[in-house]
């Protein structure tokens, strides 16, 4: 006999399947509702252009990568990484592994190569326990790693898009990003659930 679902997980499932973005994603054959978040960010911030090389961290199931390939065209390239498996997408070079593992990071950097990239984006999040004092530090660790990679591989003028959960360490992290980019915005896309602490920092114009 299966375990009874908790009230919170049952509520999440109910919200998930009644969510208009989930329904639209299913109708359009999209990987996830995250596609709509990035579409809204692109509409306001014009991050992606044809021919770009983009790094996608926390890529599975592929909503962001799926969106980006429509924006960067045949001459563009997406290098994606996730702990979870992801079905292939044309134009996406996917590496499955834990981004926190030095060997995985080295393999990812090898795929990036010597040329700088135009965008680093991260939708990474830890498995949430529901306890902010546990979840926020875990999430901040991931976004710090994403920022370190952005510093290493972004070309001058490049952009960084990162999901961050508001809480302890957020203001300090935002300050670090502002020191490296000429323009920094905080976005809460309509497709992001209102109850969620998540926001997206959109940083453009990586300084020399």
From Swiss-Prot:
<dbReference type="InterPro" id="IPR015507">
    <property type="entry name" value="rRNA-MeTfrase_E"/>
</dbReference>
<comment type="function">
    <text>Specifically methylates the uridine in position 2552 of 23S rRNA at the 2'-O position of the ribose in the fully assembled 50S ribosomal subunit.</text>
</comment>
<feature type="binding site">
    <location>
        <position position="64"/>
    </location>
    <ligand>
        <name>S-adenosyl-L-methionine</name>
    </ligand>
</feature>
<feature type="active site" description="Proton acceptor">
    <location>
        <position position="163"/>
    </location>
</feature>
<dbReference type="InterPro" id="IPR002877">
    <property type="entry name" value="RNA_MeTrfase_FtsJ_dom"/>
</dbReference>
<keyword id="KW-0808">Transferase</keyword>
<feature type="binding site">
    <location>
        <position position="62"/>
    </location>
    <ligand>
        <name>S-adenosyl-L-methionine</name>
    </ligand>
</feature>
<keyword id="KW-0698">rRNA processing</keyword>
<dbReference type="InterPro" id="IPR050082">
    <property type="entry name" value="RNA_methyltr_RlmE"/>
</dbReference>
<feature type="binding site">
    <location>
        <position position="123"/>
    </location>
    <ligand>
        <name>S-adenosyl-L-methionine</name>
    </ligand>
</feature>
<feature type="binding site">
    <location>
        <position position="82"/>
    </location>
    <ligand>
        <name>S-adenosyl-L-methionine</name>
    </ligand>
</feature>
<dbReference type="Pfam" id="PF01728">
    <property type="entry name" value="FtsJ"/>
</dbReference>
<dbReference type="InterPro" id="IPR029063">
    <property type="entry name" value="SAM-dependent_MTases_sf"/>
</dbReference>
<keyword id="KW-0949">S-adenosyl-L-methionine</keyword>
<keyword id="KW-0963">Cytoplasm</keyword>
<dbReference type="InterPro" id="IPR004512">
    <property type="entry name" value="rRNA_MeTrfase_gammaproteobac"/>
</dbReference>
<feature type="binding site">
    <location>
        <position position="98"/>
    </location>
    <ligand>
        <name>S-adenosyl-L-methionine</name>
    </ligand>
</feature>
<dbReference type="GO" id="GO:0005737">
    <property type="term" value="C:cytoplasm"/>
</dbReference>
<comment type="similarity">
    <text>Belongs to the class I-like SAM-binding methyltransferase superfamily. RNA methyltransferase RlmE family.</text>
</comment>
<dbReference type="GO" id="GO:0008650">
    <property type="term" value="F:rRNA (uridine-2'-O-)-methyltransferase activity"/>
</dbReference>
<protein>
    <recommendedName>
        <fullName>Ribosomal RNA large subunit methyltransferase E</fullName>
        <ecNumber>2.1.1.166</ecNumber>
    </recommendedName>
</protein>
<keyword id="KW-0489">Methyltransferase</keyword>
């Amino acid at each position: 006999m299966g375990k009874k679902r908790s009230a919170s997980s049952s509520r999440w499932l109910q919200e998930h399947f009644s969510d208009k973005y989930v329904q639209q994603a299913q109708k359009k054959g999209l990987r996830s509702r995250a596609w709509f978040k990035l579409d809204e960010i692109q509409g306001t911030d014009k991050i992606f252009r044809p021919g770009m090389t983009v790094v996608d961290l926390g890529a599975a199931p592929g909503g962001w990568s799926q969106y980006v390939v429509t924006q960067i065209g045949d001459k563009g390239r997406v290098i994606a990484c996730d702990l979870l498996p992801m079905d292939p997408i044309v134009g996406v070079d996917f590496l499955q592994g834990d981004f926190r593992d030095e060997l995985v990071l080295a393999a990812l950097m090898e795929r990036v190569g010597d040329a700088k990239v135009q965008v680093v984006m991260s939708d990474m999040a830890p498995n949430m326990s529901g306890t902010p004092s546990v979840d926020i530090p875990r999430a901040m660790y991931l976004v710090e790693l994403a920022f370190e990679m952005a510093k290493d591989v972004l070309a001058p003028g490049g952009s960084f898009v990162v999901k961050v959960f508001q809480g302890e360490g957020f203001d300090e992290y935002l300050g670090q990003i502002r020191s490296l980019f000429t323009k920094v915005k905080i976005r809460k896309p309509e497709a992001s659930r209102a109850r969620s602490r998540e926001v997206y920092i959109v940083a453009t114009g990586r300084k020399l």
